[in-house]
């Protein structure tokens, strides 16, 4: 009654309500603003002030409803209302906010802003399955051709939720065959499996196989064309270095590089270097050397040329041609990438440290040969040679490198405990 008699104008509401709020008289302040709504005949008036009072009282559902009134009053207030709601999200408030939002959507099922708020709430609350349900509804209701679902899939990848990310990509693949996101959904699904494989130590072979299968499905669907270089190359790398499926990878890459038409030069050279790696694994040293040299000559002063030179130096090192290896390493320019430069320095130091002590290079030749066998995935032969090396040269400076090479081999074979015993 006191409030009803004392407040007659809209202008008085803010002044009195604000004063009571600052004095901590929250219940009285709430009554003032409700009286103000009666005076203005506007159910959305003073929504921000009322929401803040409910928030202070721990009444999160009512606070959510009031912030929503900001949006109802003017859709341009969407961002402010949504941010205010999301800022409340936490263990004490989560359930109340969720229920308030769902009640709002139930009353206004076609309101895109509300749908987005619910979706963003679930993402922030890390209730990703419910977020997926909401984003699919948004896609269907507002005919978004999979765009929002695609963005959700990327968010799930960033959260390392690879299985749910793939579900989102599958949704696009199954429902949006004419969407601009159709090809990318196939491609990114394969990349997800690849990322999942490398999230584990050692690399998860089943995930690698799943990635290769996904790349094959993509290429069988869209064709093996120059514009689909990325999936062919990524698939081939997995086949070479993790599945050791050399023949099929070589066939894919040779078909890809048979004609340079439509394929950027850098991509062609990158694929040729991988072909050289396969030839080295197949012990076809002459072909490997020719392939690396081809790229080195064409890209003499560029990063790919430096990488080709480094691979040529590695090949010489594996064959025990240490002087040639050092000459090739010396030809690598200082402006190459850090990775190539660091690898070149490391290899050069290995040669220098193990050829300058005496006239014999037998130990280094054996070690280089063992590393080649490891590269070729002939682990048993490599371990046998490393054991012989350690026996013949028990106090050699290569002792630590021998242990590290053994650890690498056992790690590649998923024998983690055994690998750790050599570190």
Q: Where in this protein do the model-derived segments appear?
A:
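Acidic, polar-rich low-complexity tracts and alpha-helical solenoid repeat scaffolds
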Residues: 1-423
